Every structure is written in C-alpha cells, then in structure tokens.
Regions:
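Eukaryotic small-GTPase/lipid signaling interfaces
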Residues: 1-220
Length: 220
C-alpha cells in the first residue's frame, strides 16, 4: 500500500522527493541505543562548530545552521520512515522504536534529537494515523505523552524568565563543549541514514504536503 501510494503521488508531484529510509525489519533490528548514540555524535559535531553569535541570527539564516539542518532532516526522516511502511502493524513497530529512541535520547540529555523525533511523531501526517497508533502499546503512548509534555515551554511569554534561561545557556556552553563522546563508536552504515540529505526538488512546504498526502492514502 505504501509503495502504491508513493507511485500514485509520483504521478501527481513531479519531480518526487528522494526517500532514503530503511525497511521496517532493518530499522527495528538495530537497537534503539545505537540510533541514540549515533544521533548524539552527529549533534555533538554540529553544535561543536556553532558559535554563540548564531543565537541572534535572523530566521532564514538560522535555518541553514548545521544544528537546524540536522533537526529538520531528522524530523522529516522520522516521518518518511514511518510512512514508507506498508501496513499499520509495521508502522506501529516503527513508531514504537522511535519512542524508545526518544526515551534514550532524553536519558542521554540529547534534547535536540529528542525534540526532532517527538515533533515528527506529533506532526499531522503521523498523528492522524489512528489505526497505527492503536497498535502502539499503552505504555509507549504514555511515554510519548510524558516526553512531549516535558518539552513544553510554559514560561515562553515570560521575558524575565526567558532572559534568565538564555544567560544560563550562554554560561553552560563551554561545559557542554568539553564533554567527550570518545566512548561512543561511529557506525558508518547507521550514520549514512541519519546524515542530512538536501532536497532540491521540493521546498519544505511542498514536502509537508507530499507526506500528508501519503498519510491520507495509507489511512483515509
């Protein structure tokens, strides 16, 4: 069904975006720990070359920073990996695995990749897959809701609080840059899947429309 939907949409949207996703079997056979570790290594490299001055960059330029590119890619990759599966049962397995990865990322204090995955799981193309979500265990759905609530920003309209938090970010940056990940082993085959690939065929809005159309074809 997923392939049929893809070919149907290929006739509707030309050119169609390239999709580099693993099969459900390969994706879930690789432990969630491995994905969490590789994402952490990629994030460490991206943030290691960033500068505090980038926090004041205007939105269009900020979107091109290494950490933003990685965030957007991971979120899109999560959506595409789920939608590439042919039946609700397989999609549920993949969704469950992503929740496990997000849980481990939270434990590793890698909020960047954690937020990217959670935003993908709560995006319109994925959230609407009722049949898929009904096959995800209650414990995992509860874990997802808990993680998502932890990332909410209840004080985002409080200027004083926001300023205080920003100052803490500035002061803590040297400490985080000094953290070593030498104990983590790079796995090229996994990083190849996770590294950003630039889409020139469709803009982000077009890609979002594309994935939503795939979602509605899979589960009307």
């Amino acid at each position: 069904m997923a392939l049929k939907a893809w070919y149907w949409l290929k006739r509707k949207l030309v050119p169609v975006p390239h999709v580099r996703v693993p099969t459900a079997a390969f994706f879930t056979d690789v432990k969630a720990t491995v994905y969490a570790e590789q994402l952490t290594l990629l994030d460490a490299a991206a943030f290691g070359c960033s500068d505090i001055s980038e926090l004041g960059m205007p939105f269009p330029e900020a979107e091109q920073s290494p950490d933003s590119v990685l965030f957007n890619h991971l979120s899109e990759w999560t959506v595409r990996t789920i939608l590439a599966q042919s039946c609700p049962k397989r999609r549920a397995r993949v969704v469950s695995h992503f929740i496990d990865i997000a849980t481990l990322l939270h434990q590793m204090r890698n909020v960047h990749s954690e937020a990217a995955i959670l935003s993908a799981l709560s995006s319109a193309p994925i959230e609407r897959l009722k049949d898929t979500w009904s096959r995800v265990t209650k414990s995992r759905r509860r874990s997802f809701r808990t993680l998502w609530e932890l990332l909410c920003c209840p004080h985002e309209t409080d200027t004083d609080c926001s300023t205080s938090k920003m100052e803490k970010v500035f002061s803590s940056k040297p400490f985080h840059l000094s953290v070593s990940f030498d104990h983590l082993r790079v796995r090229p085959s996994i990083q190849h899947l996770l590294e950003p690939c630039h889409f020139t065929e469709l803009d982000p809005v077009g890609l979002g429309t594309f994935t939503f159309m795939v979602s509605t074809e899979l589960e009307p």
